[in-house]
Amino acid sequence: MLEVKNLTAIRDERILFESLSFEIHAGELVQIEGRNGTGKTTLLRIIAGLGECECGEILWQRSKIQSDRESYHQDLLFLGHQTGIKRELTALENLRFYLAVHQQTVDDPAIFEALAKVGLAGREDVPVAQLSAGQQRRVALARLWLSKKPLWILDEPLTAIDKQGVSVLEALFLSHAQQGGIVILTTHQDMFADNPKLRKIRLGDPK
């Protein structure tokens, strides 16, 4: 379970959100909504332990994330606006590197399959620097098919993804939640239309 307690964030003398509290349980799929500038990215970064807040706390499995960041990040997959991939490596090498850093053992056929899922079949050995921005983001998204982490925090994961790709990712997010994981995301795309499994948390306008 993830708990957000009395969270307040101020940026450039604006209160983005104040005394924000909610809980997210295993098996939940949550979309953070709000107009541009309401603090969606700020909130995700704070929850991921990558941003600061004026007051409040985040608890994961009833422990404050600040007290054991290493353990928390072992359970967390965060995908932000920056893809975190290495341009000098190929798509295949990037995923091998990611898995090694996170001490996961996955064979190459599974990596090839993950890249195929995001539409990069045949591009596995191309240096990332030669891929388009959308293709580079797909390399980062391929991690989702390989991850064993229970908590996914995804900031605009559908940027530059076509309609078919959105459908594939939507199915993956639902599957992760059905298996007891948690997905927290922001998106401007119309996903999960009328899906009862989706919970929405809306941020108000800054003060």
From Swiss-Prot:
InterPro entries, per database record: AAA+_ATPase, ABC_transporter-like_ATP-bd, ABC_transporter-like_CS, ABC_transptr_haem_export_CcmA, P-loop_NTPase
Domain ABC transporter residue range list: 2-204
Alphabetical list of Gene3D superfamilies matching this protein: P-loop containing nucleotide triphosphate hydrolases
PROSITE patterns: ABC_TRANSPORTER_1, ABC_TRANSPORTER_2, CCMA
Keywords of the record: ATP-binding, Cell inner membrane, Cell membrane, Cytochrome c-type biogenesis, Membrane, Nucleotide-binding, Translocase, Transport
One cellular-component annotation, GO: plasma membrane
Enzyme Commission number(s): 7.6.2.5
Membrane topology according to the record: Peripheral membrane protein
Top-level class of the enzyme under EC nomenclature: translocase
Family: Belongs to the ABC transporter superfamily. CcmA exporter (TC 3.A.1.107) family.
Descriptive protein name: Cytochrome c biogenesis ATP-binding export protein CcmA
Organism: Vibrio cholerae serotype O1 (strain ATCC 39315 / El Tor Inaba N16961)
Gene name, Swiss-Prot/TrEMBL: ccmA
